[in-house]
Amino acid sequence: LLVFDPKERYTFGPVDFSGSQIREPILQNLVPFKEGEPYFSDNIAELNRRLSASGWFNSIVVTPDIVAGRKSESKQLPVHTRVSPKIKNSVETGLGYSTDVGPRGRLIWKKPWLNDSGHSLEAAGDISKLEQMLDLSYKLPLEENALEQFWMFGGGYKHEDLNDTKADSLTFAATRRWDLYEGWQKGIALKFRLDDFTQGSLDNKTMMVYPEFSLSRTRSRGGLMPKWGDSQRYTIGYANQMWGSDIDALMLEAQYTLIRTFARKHRFVLRSHLGWIETGDFNDVPPDLRYFAGGDRSIRGYDYESISPKDENGDLTGASKMITGSIEYQLRVKGKWWGAVFFDIGRADTNFEFSNLKKGAGIGVRWESPLGPIKLDIAKPVGDSEENGIQFYIGLGPEL
C-alpha cells in the first residue's frame, strides 16, 4: 500500500527508458511532463498512452519510483519506463463476399519499426475479380514529436475492370501530417497520378499533379467492434495545368461515421459521404476520382458502383457529385451475436437535386469475432421499378 503525505508535494524526476530499440531523444520528446513539475498520475497514464500509440512496442510498464522520492530531499519521483519491442513483421487479413463482386480479400503487411529512428513500412493488397490494388507507404516520424508530426511517402497501382470502366492507375504521394488537438490531424500532400482508362466508349490518358489538404479524426472505445466511436475526414484538392496537370479540377470530399451504443444492447451506426468535382474537363477525369454509388458501405441492394449518370449508349459515365447516407440499428441477441436492420439512401449525378434518390434496405447479422466484426447482410432496392433484385454481403473488417 502506497501512502502519500498530503503535506508534502511530490514532483516529477528524470525519466529513463530500458529495453527500447528506439533512440532515447525521440522517446524523451514523447514525455508529457517536465522534471520538477507537480506529480499527477494522469501524466503517467498519458505517457503510457503515447508510447502505445507509437506502435513500436509490445509491452510498456511506466513506474514512478516512490521509494526514491521519499528519500529525496526535493521529493522528486524518478520515472522508470520498461518496454519491449513489437515484432518486426505483422500480417492482417480481411475477407468478404457480395453478390455483385464475388469474393474479395485484403492482406496488410506491416513493419512497425525499421530502425532506431522509428521509421515504419506498410504494404496493402486488395484483390477481387473486378479490382486489384497494391499500396506501399513509408512513414518518417520527426524527432521533436514523433507521434504528432511525420512525413508519409506512398505509391500504388490499381487495375479495374468493372461495369463500363477499364482502368490502370499509378499513384505517388508525399504527405506531411500534424496532430492538432483532441485527436484531430491535418495533412498537406503533393499527389501525382497517371491513368490509362476506358469509360464507356471513351478512351483516355490523364496525368494529374495536385496539392491536397486534409483534416481527419478517428475515435473509438470498445475494442474491434467499438461501442462508441466516430470517424471524420475532409479533403480538398486542386489540379491545374499551370503546374503540369492535364486538367484543371477542384475536388472536395467529406466522410463521416458515427457509432453509439445504449444500454449495452442497442447499437446505432450512421454514415454519410459527400463528394464534389468542379471541372470543365470531366471526360478527362480518371474513373478512380469520379463518383459511383451502390454496394456495401454505399447503397446496399444495388450492384457495386452501379449508380451513375449514363451516356447516350447507356454506359455508366461516373458522376461529378455524390451524396449518400445510411442508418443502421443493431440489437444484441445473445453474447457476441447481433441482429441488424438498415436503410441507405443517396445518388451520384451531375447535380445535387434531391429527386430520384436511390434507396436500399435490408437486414443482417453481426458477430464479434476475435478478428473484428463479421457481418452478413441481405438488401434490396426500395421504390425502384427498374431494380428489384436481392444482394448478399459478407464482410470482415473495421467499421471506422
Task: Walk through the language-model features, giving the residues of each.
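Gram-negative/organellar outer-membrane beta-barrel architecture
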Residues: 20, 40-233, 250, 260, ...
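Flexible hinge/switch segments at interdomain interfaces of large molecular machines
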Residues: 5, 15-27, 228
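Outer-membrane beta-barrel and related beta-rich outer-membrane complex signature
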Residues: 198-202, 246, 280-290, 353, ...
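Post-signal-peptide, soluble extracytosolic/periplasmic N-terminal scaffold domains
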Residues: 1-3
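Extracytoplasmic gating/loop element in the C-terminal half of outer-membrane beta-barrel translocons
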Residues: 77, 264-342, 350
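Second-shell loop/turn segments in exported
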Residues: 13, 17, 30-38, 122-123
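Transmembrane beta-barrel strand/turn architecture of Gram-negative outer membrane proteins
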Residues: 174, 232-240, 247-278
